[in-house]
Structures are given as C-alpha cells and as structure tokens.
C-alpha cells in the first residue's frame, strides 16, 4: 500500500500536468507567469469538461467532490486554502 501524497506533492502533480499541457500548447516559456498558468488551467478545465461530456459524466459533481477532497486535505496538513 502506498502512502497518501502530501499537499505539496499533489500541487506538483498538477504543475506537471500544466507543464505537459503548456508544451502541447507551445507556451512552456510563459508558464512561470501566474496569468498564463491561470489561462492554461482554465483551458485544461474546459478540456476536462469536454471529456466529461463525451463520457456522460457530471463534471460539476466531480468539481464538488474535488473541492471536498481539497478542503479535507488542506485541513489535514494545516494548509491555508
């Protein structure tokens, strides 16, 4: 059984995904900018919405569950959202 990832590890996984997405979008050099990272995240979430629709999944329910996980995880480690 593997240990649960820490919140910094979770954030790093998200960053790695955004880097991969940025490379695909040819905007890797701009990823350091908070504005560009936010745009990439927005684009990625929109793509996930398309994926969810294609699979007949409730995207908003997934977001709600993700928010509950985030709140529980930040509470566990004493992080501030």
Residue ranges and their predicted role:
Residues 1-5, 71-81:
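Short intrinsically disordered terminal tails
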Residues 20-24, 47, 51, 55, ...:
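Surface-exposed polar/charged interaction patches
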Residues 58, 65-75:
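Amphipathic alpha-helical binding modules
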Residues 36-64:
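An amphipathic alpha-helical micro-motif enriched in hydrophobic residues
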Residues 1-39:
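N-terminal acidic leader/helix
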